[in-house]
C-alpha cells in the first residue's frame, strides 16, 4: 500500500463513518413523522421479511402523520401489523382499506431530552470511529516508514489530522442540527 492509498482509504472510511452517524440520526424520532424512521421496518410478505420501502410508498400530509400506501393491497394487513410493532414510537395506526395512517403523539420534554442523550451517544460513537480510522491509518504509515521518507510520512500524518478534524466537525454539525430538531416544539 502506498502513502496516497493510505490517505485515500482513510478519507473514504471516515466519510462512510460520518454517513453512518447521519443515518443513525435519521432513525431517532423527532416531533415529526419521517419516512427514515421506517427504513429498517421489516414486513412479513409471502413468508419472507421484506423492507417496508419495497412494499409501499410513504408521504407526510402533516408533520406528525405518515401515510403508507402499499403497492399491493393484499399486503395492507401485514404492513399495519409491522407498523404497530415498531418499538419506542407509541403511535396510533389506522387502516382504511386503501392505506395505513400512522400518527405520532407529541413528544414530552422528558422524552425529547432522552432522545438528545441517545443522539449524543451516537455522535460520540461516530467520533470514536473516525479517530480509530486515523489510528489505523497511522499504523499503516508507520509500516511504510522504511520505504518512504520521514518528510512524506510527516506530511501525510498532518493531512490525516486535518481529515480527522474535518470529519469530527461534520459529526458535531449533524449533532447540533439533530439536537435543534429534537428540542423544537
Curated annotation (Swiss-Prot):
Coiled coil ranges: none
Q: Name one GO cellular component term.
A: cytoplasm
Phylogenetic lineage: Bacteria, Bacillati, Actinomycetota, Actinomycetes, Micrococcales
Alphabetized, the UniProt keywords read: Cytoplasm, Protein biosynthesis
Q: Give one GO molecular function term.
A: ribosomal large subunit binding
Tell me which InterPro entries the record gives: Ribosome_recyc_fac, Ribosome_recyc_fac_dom, RRF_sf
Species this protein is from = Clavibacter sepedonicus
Q: What family classification does the UniProt entry report for this protein?
A: Belongs to the RRF family.
Location comes to:
Cytoplasm
Q: Which GO terms describe its biological process?
A: translational termination
By its UniProt entry, which HAMAP family does this protein fall under?
A: RRF
Q: What is this protein called?
A: Ribosome-recycling factor
Q: Which CDD domains match?
A: RRF
According to its UniProt entry, the function of this protein is described as: Responsible for the release of ribosomes from messenger RNA at the termination of protein biosynthesis. May increase the efficiency of translation by recycling ribosomes from one round of translation to another.
Entry keyword annotation includes tRNA processing? no
| Predominant subcellular localization, coarse grouping | cytoplasm
Amino acid at each position: 500500500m502506498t502513502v496516497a492509498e493510505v490517505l485515500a482509504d482513510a478519507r473514504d472510511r471516515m466519510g462512510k463513518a460520518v454517513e453512518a452517524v447521519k443515518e443513525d440520526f435519521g432513525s431517532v424520532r423527532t416531533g415529526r413523522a419521517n419516512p427514515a424512521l421506517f427504513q429498517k421496518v421489516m414486513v412479513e410478505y409471502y413468508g419472507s421479511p421484506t423492507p417496508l420501502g419495497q412494499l409501499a410508498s410513504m408521504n407526510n400530509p402533516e408533520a406528525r402523520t405518515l401515510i403508507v400506501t402499499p403497492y399491493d393491497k393484499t399486503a395492507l394487513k401485514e404492513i399495519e401489523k409491522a407498523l404497530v410493532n415498531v418499538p419506542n414510537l407509541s403511535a396510533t395506526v389506522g387502516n382504511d382499506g386503501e392505506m395505513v395512517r400512522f400518527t405520532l403523539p407529541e413528544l414530552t420534554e422528558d422524552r425529547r431530552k432522552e432522545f438528545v442523550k441517545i443522539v449524543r451517544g451516537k455522535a460520540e460513537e461516530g467520533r470514536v470511529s473516525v479517530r480509530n480510522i486515523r489510528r489505523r491509518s497511522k499504523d499503516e504509515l508507520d509500516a511504510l516508514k522504511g520505504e518512504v521518507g520521514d518528510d512524506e510520512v510527516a506530511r501525510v500524518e498532518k493531512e490525516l489530522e486535518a481529515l480527522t478534524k474535518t470529519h469530527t466537525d461534520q459529526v458535531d454539525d449533524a449533532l447540533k442540527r439533530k439536537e435543534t430538531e429534537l428540542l423544537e416544539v
